[in-house]
Amino acid sequence: MTTPRMSLLLICAVFALPAAAQPPKSARLIELPGSGTAALWSETIGGVEQAYYAVARGREPFGLAIPTTHVVRLRYAEFDPLHEAPEPGLMADPASELRIVQFFTQVLPEYTEAIEALGGRVLAILHDNAVIARVPATGAAVLRSEAWVRWIGPFHPAYKLEEALLAEFEQLVLNVPERVYSIQVFERGLAQQEVVAARVISLGGAVQCLTPPGRRMEARLSQAALLEIVGMDEVQFVDRWGPVETDMDQARVIGGAVPLLSGLGFTGQGVRGEVFDLGVRMSHMAFRDPNIVLHVTNTGSISHGTSTYGIVFGNGAAEPLGTGLLPNRQQGIFAAANQVTQFGGPKPRHDHTAELVDPNGPYRAVFQSSSVGSPWSLQYTTVSAEVDDYLFTYDLLSCQSQSNSGDQNSRPQAWAKNIVAVGGLDPHNTLDRSDDNWNYASYGPAADGRQKPDLLHFNEDVLCPSSSSDTSYQPNFNGTSAATPIVAGYFGLLFQMWHEGVYPGHGGAATVFDSRPRSTTAKALMLSTAYRYPLTQGGLTRARQGWGMPDLGRAYDERLNTYIVDETHLISAFVTNTYTFNVPDGTPQFRATLVYRDPPGTPNSSVHRVNNLSLRVVAPGGQAYWGNFGLTSSNWSSPGGAADFRDTVEHVFVATPAAGQWTVQVRGEEIVQDGHVQTPQLDASYALVVVGKGPEPVGCPGDINLDGQVDQADLGALLSVFGTIVGQLSYNGLADLNADGAIDQADLGIMLSAFGGGC
C-alpha cells in the first residue's frame, strides 16, 4: 500500500520542481487499468496553485509532468463538475446512455479499453481530460467506483445545440419555421445517419443529404421535430445549414514571385491545383494552353470564379499586368461549389477531396483555393469539423477565405484547424508596405482562442480576368476572395520550388505531385518565412494579419539555413523529440515553427484541438521559450511563459540569437486520438521548420544527432533504442528512419547503407 507520504516522497524524487515552487500538495498515486500508475499532485508557484499529473506504464519511468485543470469545456458552459454542474432546461432522458466521463489524466488507451469492456464506447474527446461515451447504466455504476475516473454525468441535449437554436427553446420562441439543419452524428459512415434519417422521416421531415464517408447529414425539420432529433443518442451536434456565399501585378512582386522567382524559372511549371468557386468563363483567353480541366461540372454564376481562377492560373493574355501567380502551370482545375453536400449538391466533400489527391486519378492536385463558404459563424461548427475531417484524412493544402464582415464573423470553413485561413489588407495600390492597413476583412481569434487567419494578402485593387468577355479584365477585384487565390498561388510556387530541390534533400521525384511535401510542411514553411507587419501599423494586430504575408523571396534566400521535418518523425504521449542546432555569431533570427494535422474537433466543446503537441526552444544560456508565448503583442517571442494548449500551429521567433547550441523540443503533451494512422500505435506526426542554423548540412537519413555525419555516434543512438515502438518512453522518433513506428532491422539497414558518409 502506498501512503500519502510515500507518494509525496516519490513525486519529489522523480520530478524536478521549479526553484520558486513550494513542496507539492495533495500528492497521491492511483492505479490505472492494466499495469500503469498515475502520479497526481499540485504545486504553488507565484501564489497560484497548479495541478499536475504524470503517467508510468509497467516498468517504464514516468513521462512528462503535464499541467492540467479539471474543467469540462463545453460551448454550453465551462465547469468543474465536482463543484458545480449545470442543470439545463433540455435535460437528457433517464434512458439515455450518453455520458461525459472525466479522468484525472488525459484520455489513455487503457480507459477506452476499460469502457469497452463494460459494454460502452468512447465517441468523442472533450477537454479537460474527458470523453463523451455511450455507456449502459450498469457500466456507468462500475465507472463511478474506479480510482481513475474523476466524474461521470449525463450528456444533455442542451449541449448538442448551436447557441441560437438553444435560445429559441429556452425563450419559448414560437412559430419557428421549418429549416434545413446540419446534423453531426457520433460515428463515421451511414449506420447512425440512416437511423437518424428514418426518425426524421417519421417526424414529417425531409432528408436533404447523407455523407457516407463522413458524419454529417442535412435535414429539413420543424422545431418540434428538432427537439426529438437532438434527444437521440446517435446525434452529437446540430446547427443551422446555409447555402454557398462568396466572399494583380503588385501582388506578384511583393511576395517575390517576380522578378526573383520568375527570373529563376519558377512560374508554375509542373504544378496542378484546383480553384473551388461558383462558375468560370471557360473560354477566356487567359485560361488557354492548357485549357481548364473541370472537376465534374461548371454551374452557377461565372463572374466570381473567373476572377479567382485567373488570379491563380491566368497567363496574362490581353493584359500582361493581370498575369496570375502560376501562368505556366501544368494544369489548372476548376470545381463548382454547388456540386458538394456542404452547398446543396450530391457529392460529399470527402469524396471530392479524395479524387483531387488520388495518385492514379486525373487531377493530382497539390493545393486547393476556395473563396466561397457557408454563412458566417463565430463558432467551430459541424461544417468546420467536416473540413478538419477530410483534410486530416487526405492531406491536401487547402486555402479558405476568412470573409469580409469587418469583425470576427467568418466562414466556418476558415475556423478549421487543418486549413489555411486567409485574411486581407488594403495595399493602397503600392508596393510600399508601410502604408498598408487592415480595412474590413474578417479576423480572429477563433472561439477557442486559436490564431486565425493564418496568412493575409491584398483585398483591394487586384487586377485579374473578368467574365464580361474572353479578353476582359477588372482592375479592382477585392475582398478575401482576392487574397485567398493570391496566397494559394504562392503555395503553388512553393510546391514547385520543393520539387526542383530548392531545399536540399527534398523533392526530385518524377512530378510536383509525387515530390510534394506534406500540407503541414508547406504551411510551416510559408508561415515561418512570411513578412510580419508591425502590430501597431494600421490595425494589423495578430488577430487580423495572422502570421503575415507570404514572402517566397525570403524563403528562397533562407533555403540553405533551413532544417525541415516533413512528418518523418513520430511522437507519442509524454515523450519529447529533441533537436540541437549550432547558431553562428551574427545570425539575424532564429525561428522554429511546428504544425501538425489534428483529427476533427468536437463542436460541442469550447476547445477544438484534440491532440496537443507543444514547441519549446532553449537558448545556449538555458533561457526557455514556449511556442506562441508573447507573439500576440509582439513579433518576437518572450522568454518563459507556458505551453500553448489550444493551437496546432506554434512558433518561436528570436531576434539576434546568441551564438552557440540551441535546442528545439517537440513535446507530446497530450495525444488522445491517433494522429498518424499509418502505424497501429496511438501517435502523431508533425512538420517542423527551423531557420537560423549554421550552414552545415544536417538531417540526412541516419544522421540522428544532426551533426552532418552518419557515424558511430548515430549507430550507438539507434542501437540504444533498438526494438522499441512508438508509445514507449524510450522510443526516439529521430531513430525511426522509415517512420513506421518501430525501430528495427529496416532502420538499421538504412543506417548502415549511409554509414561513414556526410549529409
Language-model-detected regions and their locations in the chain:
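Surface-exposed beta-strand/loop patches in noncatalytic accessory domains
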Residues: A117, R121-I125, H608-R646
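Cellulosome-associated attachment modules in secreted, modular CAZymes
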Residues: G508, P695-C759
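Autoinhibitory N-terminal propeptides
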Residues: A21-F266, V271-R272, V340
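C-terminal edge strands of extracellular/lumenal beta-sandwich accessory domains
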Residues: R518-L525, N577-Y579, H608, V617-A619, ...
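The feature captures the short pre-catalytic strand/loop hairpin that immediately precedes
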Residues: T430-D435, H457-P485, D566
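Bacterial N-terminal signal peptides
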Residues: S7-P18
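Subtilisin-like serine protease catalytic core
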Residues: V176-P177, V195, L260-P346, P362-F367, ...
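Secreted peptidase-domain scaffold signal
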Residues: Y503-G505, F513, P517, P534, ...
